[in-house]
Design a protein with these regions (language model features):
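Primarily recognizes the serine-hydrolase "nucleophile elbow" in alpha/beta-hydrolase
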Residues: 94-156
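Short beta-strand element of the alpha/beta-hydrolase
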Residues: 25-35
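The serine-hydrolase catalytic nucleophile loop
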Residues: 36-48, 62
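The feature captures the conserved acid-bearing segment of alpha/beta-hydrolase catalytic domains
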Residues: 144-202
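C-terminal catalytic histidine-bearing segment of alpha/beta-hydrolase fold enzymes
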Residues: 205-239
Length: 239
């Protein structure tokens, strides 16, 4: 049994899930980020599955999404990379709030996400060594080059603030903790080549000892039951 509800964390509305009777107890905690044009509620099956496995799950709405969306779809579609950047800069306050409320057990804080959320997870891993482990599904850490083809910004300078979180020149920061990469080979939004590139770079540098990379044939840009199960297994093993 689990408990599922809405809480504000650092002023941001989140979906909050825990095993029943544990809402105010310290638990190993997963901060999980949703995809672009989606919301915390659409991805709530991750909260359910992970809470059933014993974790606290905190799923924020990204800027201009879910409870934070004002209905201006055209504006949102032009702000992909700026929204990703906002995910990065909001993390510190959310983490601090969770710790201040005594909700994270023994510094066991993980980050996961899918699509834009998977990009968020990889970027945060480069800057936050305190994160215990990371799961990135359908994501990429190569923001500065991916922006050439995925939601290219009208102003190329919009990508510049993402440099600090791009994985290209800091692979070692992805190698010192467990990392799960999952991607559907037939992904028609974020190419699976993004995950393959990262996995290959880690292997070639001898930095893959804690890497789990799973690629599913014939799967497009969607989360499968197998991907959900792999994510739960990963956090059960490493968080």
């Amino acid at each position: 049994m689990i408990e599922l509800g809405i809480r504000h964390v650092a002023g941001i509305e989140t979906l909050h899930a825990t095993p029943v009777g544990s809402q105010d107890r310290a638990l190993p905690t997963v901060l999980f980020y949703h995809g672009f044009t989606s919301s915390k509620l659409v991805y709530s099956y991750f909260a359910v599955a992970l809470a059933q496995a014993g974790f606290r799950v905190v799923m924020p709405d990204a800027r201009d999404h879910g409870a934070r969306f004002d209905g201006d779809e055209a504006h949102r579609l032009a702000q992909f990379w700026q929204i990703l950047h906002t995910n990065f800069v909001e993390f510190d306050a959310m983490k601090a709030a969770l710790y201040a409320d005594g909700l994270v057990a023994d510094d066991r804080l993980a980050v996961g996400g899918a699509s834009m959320g998977g990009m968020t997870a990889l970027g945060l891993m480069t800057q936050h060594p305190e994160i215990t482990c990371v799961a990135s599904l359908m994501g990429s850490g190569y923001f500065t080059t991916l922006a050439d083809t995925l939601f290219p910004p009208a102003d190329p300078q919009a990508i510049a603030p993402l440099d600090n979180w791009d994985v290209t020149h800091q692979l070692d920061r992805l190698a010192d903790r467990p990392l799960l990469l999952w991607h559907g080979i037939a992904d028609d939004v974020v190419p699976a080549a993004q995950t393959q590139r990262l996995a290959q770079a880690l292997r070639q540098a001898g930095l893959d000892a804690q890497l789990t990379c799973l690629l599913d044939e014939g799967v497009k840009h969607r989360i499968t039951p197998a991907a959900l199960e792999a994510t739960v297994r990963f956090f059960c093993a490493h968080l």
